[in-house]
Every structure is written in C-alpha cells, then in structure tokens.
Amino acid sequence: MTNLENIDWAHLPFGYMKTDYNVRCTFKDGKWGEIEVTQDETVNLHMAASCLHYGQEIFEGLKAFRGKDGKIRLFRPEENAKRLQNSARGILMEPLPEDIFLEMCKKVVKLNERFIPPYGSGSSLYLRPVEIGIAPRVGVSPADEYMVIIFVTPVGPYFKEGFHCTKVAVFREYDRAAPCGTGRWKVGGNYAAGMGATARAKAAGYSAALFLDPKEKKYLDECGPANFFIVKGNTYITPKSGSILPSITNMSLQQIARDLGMEVEARPVPLEELAEADEAAECGTAAVTAPISEVVDMDKDVHYIISKDGEVGPKVTALYNRLRAIQMGDYPDEHGWVVFVD
C-alpha cells in the first residue's frame, strides 16, 4: 500500500496517485450487477470493445473534502449522477441509476479515506467515474454491456498557478465540439478534440485555449476543459450554447452570485465583449475557479486586458471563497449541496 508519510499535501499536483481501492459496476443481460471492490488498476477489455472503436466512453469529475470538523463532504454528487446519465443517453449508452452512483461514490471515498487531504491543505480527493462500452462491436452500433469504474486520487490545483491570474489564447482553427454534436455531454472525444489547441496555447506561454462557438466563430464557448464567465459591474455573465457542457461548478457559482446580490446572465457572449469585462475566470470541478487577467486573440493580435495589475478581482475572489467555504463546511450549506460520507 502507498506510504503517506512523505506526502506534501499542500503541494500536490493535479495528477494520478495510486490509492488503495476502486469500485466497479457492470451492466449485462439487461441489468446492473452488484458493486465490486478491487485493488486492480487495470481493465481487461475485449479488443473489439465499443469504447475502443466507436467512442462509447463518458466520464465525470467530483471531489471529496475533509472539513475542520473532521467530516467528509461530497459536493453535489447527485448532479454528477444526472449529468453522467444525460451523457449516456446522448451516445446511446446505458444510464447508471443515481442511487448506484451515489453508493459507489460513498464507498470508494470511505475505502480510500486515508488519502483525503487534511483540512487547510488546499487539496482534495478527486473522484473520476468513467463508463465504457465493453461489448465487442465491429459494425457501428451501441454496445449492450457497460462498465462503470470510480477511482480516486488526491489532487492539488488543476493549474500550477493556483488561485492567481493566468492568460489564455484564442485560436480559430480549432473546435472542441460540433454545433449539434457531443459538446453538451461529457464525452472523452471532446477533450481529445481540444488537445491540439491546449498544447499550442501552453507552448506559447498561456494556461489554456479559449474556444469560440463552432458555427460562427463569434461567441465564447469553453475555456480549456472548463466553463467560462465574466463579470461586468455587478453582473455575472456566462456563455450559453448547445455545444457547452453544463458545468456543476458554474451552476453553483451562478447561485452564489445571486446570494451575493449579483445579477446573472446566461447568453451568447461575443468575443469583443471581453473589452467590457471587469473580471473573468474559467470554472469547473478540477479548476474550481481560475481567474484570467488577459485573453489574446492570436489570429488578430488583439489583447483583451481584463486585469491591468494582474491581480484577482473582488467579485471572482468572493465567489471562489464562498464556494470553497461551502465545500469545506466553513459556510452554511443553504442550498443542500453537501452530501456527508459517514
């Protein structure tokens, strides 16, 4: 078993660390089986499995936190269950029932409790549920057998900068999803489609690529692997389109913005509107909230300076602090978002 004595919990990367157990559940003969616990990190797949040839693979990401009170909290896991189901229906996979999903999440966290970073470290236990089609298919058709796996790993911030401003780049020759394609579902192929833009952005010194809408190349879409929002005055504005994945973090931040007395708008956001933004950030389970100081349109050499001094703005800071406080149990859970793991 992994020795935890020398782990620096406050400086964890966002990467894989071997933990003790993962949990699995298989759909076969028209029904879901029992939850299985294993220490095996590998999956034995048929060489013609539909996940390998026709992209029947979906996944989720959520986190468990240890509070000052010592209690373990999951943040809105039922929303991840619903989104996984929606993704499954989108590419003709078998939706995992919500009660099984929640039981698997609680079980895998409890089994790996010693890997939950301590309160105050800034790190968390990341859960990665993944569903794959495992039945052999040579012709293009959905499988009739599926496996759901949930593994966990302790992680630090997704971006090495942490909660500090970063710069992002726009490249028009890349799309992460088609206008009526899989962008609204958490399908692995969406992330493969974005790797080229991300690699190019990082090679140029930026933290991520900001995608434009795939139809007109006019409106803001997603930012790297996350949603995006701007603040104008007292208004929280986030892009809305059928190619954007509904972010649970973004949904939560919108409610927090209302709680803080802000207006909220979800609508198409033209790239040029960045010139009017007072603050900007990307948001998601992995990134939580990653502030952005500048967006560079690489094709037109236009620089949208959002933070002149490179510092995080007050509204993004307040949103981030409130969200983190709820997740850690430091602020009352007024909306019933937290699920305890006993």
Predicted stretch roles:
Residues 1-108, 130, 137-342:
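Helix-start/capping segments and mature chain N-termini
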Residues 117-128, 132:
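Extended, Lys/Arg-enriched charged tracts that mediate electrostatic binding to polyanionic substrates
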